[in-house]
Amino acid sequence: LYPTILANAGTMKNKGLEIRLSAIPVQTKNFQWVTTFNYSTNSNEVVSLSNNQFRVERGYFYAGYLGNTIKQDTHIVKEGEQMGNFYGFKSIDVDENGKWIIQGKDGNPKPIDQQQQEDKMVLGNGLPKHFLSWDNTFTFKNFDLNLTMRGAFKYQILNTPRLYYEVPVSLAHGNLMATAYDPVFGKRPLNDHQELQYVSYY
């Protein structure tokens, strides 16, 4: 028996804007160039995670489990906040022994070994706020060529290869990245005994 059940009970609100501009800069008997610019932006909010039939114990749940090595979630889905929020410890420094210093819930620095669940915070968001694309179609007689460039802006990513393989302690399990012993924050490398930690540095 399982203590929980998955249900499609949530409500989310989305709003955004999309702008599309097209032009034909060149058009002759045998040649045509059509160009199109497209811009879009979107924002969202988790309105509710419950309904009349199903209800979560709290107004949030965690997602994005990193696996047995780290045993931490990467995201939080919370009522009143955006989807895609990274949630974890904010790393602000390394101490003289090469161990993480994080920002505590009171805003003050504290050693990673003294971490508490309450010290976790929203570290960023993995959903792009802006999209921009530029599409060009060139037609010459019966031949055509299409070139498209697309960009996504104002979002964060989690670099999991660095999280796992840029930490000296991982040498006990295999190869490391060449940057594993580079100074962190320009100060010193991580300690050989600093455990894998999901922090904002990555």
Give the role of each language-model region.
Residues 1-9, 43-127, 135, 144-202:
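Surface-exposed, extracytoplasmic segments of Gram-negative outer-membrane nutrient-acquisition systems
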